[in-house]
Every structure is written in structure tokens, then in C-alpha cells.
Amino acid sequence: MLLLKKQTEDISSVYEIREKLGSGAFSEVMLAQERGSAHLVALKCIPKKALRGKEALVENEIAVLRRISHPNIVALEDVHESPSHLYLAMELVTGGELFDRIMERGSYTEKDASHLVGQVLGAVSYLHSLGIVHRDLKPENLLYATPFEDSKIMVSDFGLSKIQAGNMLGTACGTPGYVAPELLEQKPYGKAVDVWALGVISYILLCGYPPFYDESDPELFSQILRASYEFDSPFWDDISESAKDFIRHLLERDPQKRFTCQQALQHLWISGDAAFDRDILGSVSEQIQKNFARTHWKRAFNATSFLRHIRKLGQSPEGEEASRQCMTRHSHPGLGTSQSPKW
């Protein structure tokens, strides 16, 4: 699918802008209706003046999205360029974010979590087959296609994705709580970083809090580097051994021993009937509400500590700037708003 940048003097001649859906580091996302039709899109509006020095990030996102066509991945439908802006017309998904939907459910089981993870694994496996590493998988980037109960889950936000031309990538990228050990060590890394992030997401989906967290940045990084986490009682008492085994294979310290997406898809917790059908909504939703309140997990953070850690490992200034643009931070599980979270 080749999407050329279509030149326009005024985007309002192409789309009727309805309302603001959200905003990012250097863009706004608007609900827009295509002129002459009823078709709606999520229009990502990027001021060119905000792109100075960051052109490569956006060009990379476009290059990645042009290669993708998968039912569980938000599609790029069109690209427009005006004298002042670049516009990415994205497939509109209307079902809301992952945590919000879990909180709204009447019941929620391991089987539901397994089904969710299986869909995301399928999408990420597809990306990996194209040589694409997402690099920023986290719950906020998992959206439901529609508001209906049987809606599929969609992977979004490819701003940090990278086409892996060789065997490994080098720039530190991601979100601290989801970042793989090899990335923290500033070693060359590849597709396995996405599998690690899916391990963190799977863990959260089953208990409502993250596997790695601490008020101290060095301790947080130490936990990740050692792959040090627990299946705490009572939160994991009603979770199957199969689920725990699945997570252990995804949160494997050694990327060479870590499951690939294909191996994860074949695990019985995903492909078989090993997932329990017991309702865990009460405990999971309580923990999600405590640890991922919208005001916390939407909040951008100052990535000073992460970058200090990277500097100690000798990363180049160019890589450090890329990392600074990549970082997003969220709240420490179980802490009040007055405390300073480090995960």
C-alpha cells in the first residue's frame, strides 16, 4: 500500500474537523469527516514547526504504517501535507482504552485476558514477520475497535516503531515499566523487547498492578535487570499455573531464551483451555483503579533518571535525544498522589 503525501492548501477542504480526540508530544488528534462522504477518521495533525529536528520520527512512523495491514492494528488511511502541517488520517477506533473497558465490564476472567493477549500477540507476530519492532507496547496503546462487547483489540501508536533492517537495533526507547533488560543495558536488541512488554501487560491484566516498581529508580532498574518479580498472594492465588508459566517465558531475563511471539501463541494458556474461567474482576479492577488512575497513567514524566542510567552506559547524544522523545512515565502501584513513583 503506497500512500503518497497529498498536497493541500487547507485541510478543511478535505475534512470537516469535528472535535479534538487527544494530543501527543507534538501533535493533536482530531475527529474528522471526509468531505463528500460519511467516512470518519482520526486525523493526526502535526505542525511542521514542531517537527524541526524530529522529521525522522514522523517519516519513520509513516514508513512503518505504510507497510502494515492487519485486523488488530490501527491502519493509516491517508497522508496529507499543507504548507504548515502534516496530516495522518488514521482508522477511527471508538471502543476506548483497555483499562477503561475492563473497569466497565460486568465480569472478567483469565480466559478474557488470554483472548486479549492472544489478539495482541497475533498483531505483534505479524509486525515481527515484516521486520518491524513496535518498541512501545503498553496498555495505553491497546484500543478497542468498537464499543460493543465482542469488539476486537487494536494495537496503536507506531511513533517509536522501527523497521529492523539488520539483526539488531540500538537506540534506547520505550516506557520504563515495560522496558526489557537488554534495552536498559544498552545492548543491541530486537523483537524480543516487544515480547517482554507483552509479558508485563499480561501480568497486569491478571492482577491489576505491574511486576516491576519501586520509589527508587536504581532499584526499579535493578528489578528489571534481574527479572525480579513475584506472583504475590492473595492477588495470584486464583490464577492458573499455566498463566504463571506463560508469563515466566515472556519475562525471561535472557532475550535468547525468551519466547518469540510464535512460541507464545502456541502456549496452552493462549491456544488451549488452560486459562481459568473464574471471575477476577473485583480484585483486578480494584488494583487497576488504585495503580492506573487516569490522572496518573496519562501523565508525562521527566525522564531524567532513565537518561542518567543510559548516560552511565555511554549512549551517544543522538541516541539520548531519541530516548528523551520516547519516554513516558506512569504512577507507582499502591502509592498516593503525593508520593513520587519510580516505575
From Swiss-Prot:
The gene is Pnck. Calcium/calmodulin-dependent protein kinase belonging to a proposed calcium-triggered signaling cascade. In vitro phosphorylates CREB1 and SYN1/synapsin I. Phosphorylates and activates CAMK1. Expressed at highest levels in adult brain, and expressed in embryo. In the adult brain detected at high levels in the anterior olfactory nuclei, piriform cortex, septal nuclei, bed nuclei of the stria terminalis, hippocampal pyramidal cells, dentate granule cells, amygdala, hypothalamic nuclei, parabrachial nucleus, and nucleus of the solitary tract. Expressed at lower levels in adult ovary and heart and at very low levels in testis, lung and muscle. Residues 290-311 are annotated as: Calmodulin-binding. Its main location: cytoplasm. It holds the Pfam family Pkinase. Its EC number is 2.7.11.17. GO terms for molecular function: ATP binding; calcium/calmodulin-dependent protein kinase activity; calmodulin binding; protein serine kinase activity. It is found in: Cytoplasm; Nucleus. The modification Phosphoserine is found at residue 338. Residues 15-270 form the Protein kinase domain. Keywords: ATP-binding, Calcium, Calmodulin-binding, Cytoplasm, Kinase, Nucleotide-binding, Nucleus, Phosphoprotein, Serine/threonine-protein kinase, Transferase. It is an enzyme of class 2 (transferase). This is Calcium/calmodulin-dependent protein kinase type 1B. Residues 314-343 are annotated as: Disordered.
